[in-house]
Amino acid sequence: RQVSLPSSWSELWAAAWSAWIPGGDGYAGGADPLTILMAILSAPFAPMGITPGAFATFLLVASTPIAAMVAWIPSRVLASSLRVRFLVSLAWSLAPSLLMSATHGVLAATLAHAALPIFVAYCVGQPKPLLVAGAGGIDEAPLRPRGINGGCAALALVVLACCAPWILPLGAGVLAWRSRRSLLVALPALVLLVPTYVSIAARPSAWPALASTSGGVHAYTRADSWMAMLGMPAAPSTPLEAAALGIIGAGGIAAAGIALLRLRTRCAAFAFCGALVAAATGWAAAQIGVGISGAFVAHAWTAPALSLSFGALLVLAARSGSGNEDEVEASRPAWDGSRPFTVRALGALSALVLLGAGGGVAASAFAARGDAADTPTFTLAQRSTVSPMSSPIVSAVASQAQRSTRAGRILVLDGDPTTGTVNAFLWRGSGPSLTDGSPATRALALAQARSGAAEGVLRDPATASLAQAAYTLVVYPDDATVATLAAHDIDTILVPLGASGSQALTSGLDRASGLEKVGDTNSGTVWRVRPGGVTPSRVRVESASGVTTPVGGSQLSVSGDVDASGTLILAERADSGWRASVDGTALAATEAADGWSQAFEMPTAGHLTLTYSAWWIIPWRIASGVCLVVAAASALSAWRKR
């Protein structure tokens, strides 16, 4: 399923370059790499009024033509024949890994698939001269076709690394094998992802995050080993989808196998074995848990590894000519010369088979979404594949609170308290958001959940506080529990339509004082959290007499006049990076009574400034900006006139 993006580009941009992750009760660290990438890619469209969410949806829907168009230019490295290049681009755009990633809404995998041919073409080398038919026979054209320069390769590697962080070490190894100077191509991606790699490497519990794509996790049915060898990262949902994807994957293996028998070279054998190893590695990595999706363990989505495998098979098939490479060069026809009828017929048949299989996958996807209009939105959101939603997953009341200066959050409850199971999710956006976490935080959340299940104790104070309050609220509700929820800046509580145990959950919430029932909406049943009539806020000032004053701000900072004094409390995890000042005078941090939130002593009223800062954030921003600008300038130089 596709995660949501902020409604405005400015909010996405701020989250991308922040040292604080605005998800749940907040985390210290760099943003998800896909957040950074989407902030950059969507920047040109922001002045047109195109939201990041609409742009991401377009990238998913148009992933097949985008992959075909991007692969067309790099395909010149493999062959000069337009027919061969067309077949290679068509096959690449209909690869099983890409089609399933688009169906499951995994944006990172689709972008990685599109960028991979550019980087591979740079590593393979410059294209050979075109052969033209002259008066004296077949001769080389005086000018070589343009290849992929270092700037284009650097930007492609940035996309690949942001989508699948494990690709950067692999890509750096390939660049080092090509030449030491080529390692400069990996510098922009390395600088951009330094916070991600440091956050993962610093905690062994986060190491599994390297196995998956960035941009969120989702629970899905893993593919069998033979399906992975055919390029499928997940089990097909219908027999039609299985047959169509199987035809494409098996066709790629068959074409590469025939090419291997014809070429009989070490490079061909290495490419074929490398493709099998990449597919096997992808299947093995899919067994690794990398996060939590609802009440389930989410395993690594390894489509980029299967794309690498499929790409190696296509390279081998496209480069096949005859048994000896020297003979191929000697007997190559002109680039636009006529081919034998058998070859042309085989190419046309291959194109028809690919298009038919792609149509089968599309038909299967549309058939699976046929019941979307009659299915509750929350149930659709729990599916592993994407579906159109007839109503928003968040009610208008909750959405308004989120967009207000209080930055209210939503507590979503699922499960059955009669069996001792309550699932609680804290949302800052319209469902799980791209800015909610990072690969490291998701892997750590899974590790903490497993540790808590084994030991019976949650070691993170914020998580323990929310879990205890959510369960108590529906079983033995009291005023203190509602106040605890307000301390987490929970403005509304949602029991979605289609949630399991909704009747028992609703019964418990109706008994709780301090909750105002809004009623039944298209999203589900909604309550406002109002302990003692106080409106929750992300930032508040509590006076010594017990008066609470909400303070307006954004998800990441506060700047404004506050007519109150006492203890300044943030509904964010305590961290030494938080800085607060009143009229330019720094406030002293203090320990909050709840044991998890950030607090400051605020003796006087005045103009409050509250930000989060880390020592590394400014140097990282500057270095990233310089590297990206240099790479973009180098890429644009490829289009200068000769």
Place the predicted regions along the sequence by residue:
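Hydrophobic/aromatic-rich transmembrane helices and adjacent perimembrane loops
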Residues: V61-T64, G294-E329
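Membrane-interface helix-loop-helix junctions at transmembrane boundaries of multi-pass membrane enzymes
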Residues: S182-L183, A256-I288
